[in-house]
């Protein structure tokens, strides 16, 4: 499984280098948390590579909210060109991954926030044995509140991938307290032009360590 493919400036280069270095020849599940260009930047290149030079992609999972960017159009063109199965994925769906349980907790139906892409990210809880991971895409306060209200303690996870690159609009106190992670991973540029991750969010996690 591959979740998101990075910024459009990189065009999937670093993701592909990593996959090739680890002898990955097939992606059974390609998950697009949401269709912002900093999350789908490598989708087209990765689809092209795996469908023409490797062993293909089993299926793509997408929340179904379009973006008006060239990056998004190139992604859809690659899906169509190579006839890859594309699922519009919503809360309650499951992804078959053998003995590992993958539950889709978002986006809900109907969508939140007038179809805002961040607030309707695909949110996955992945559980293998005693270890669990919560991947929250770019979920912000409203989607986090929905998740807390809907799932409560079911959100508890060993590892949290913090929402929206550690932005102040995500990782709200009620959400962090409910997930109660032992480890937090923040994906962000080293010197983000947006100031991600924010000191407030970093301190929030530090206070709970």
Regions found by a protein language model. Give the residues of each.
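Non-globular, low-confidence helical/coil segments that flank catalytic cores
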Residues: 1-209
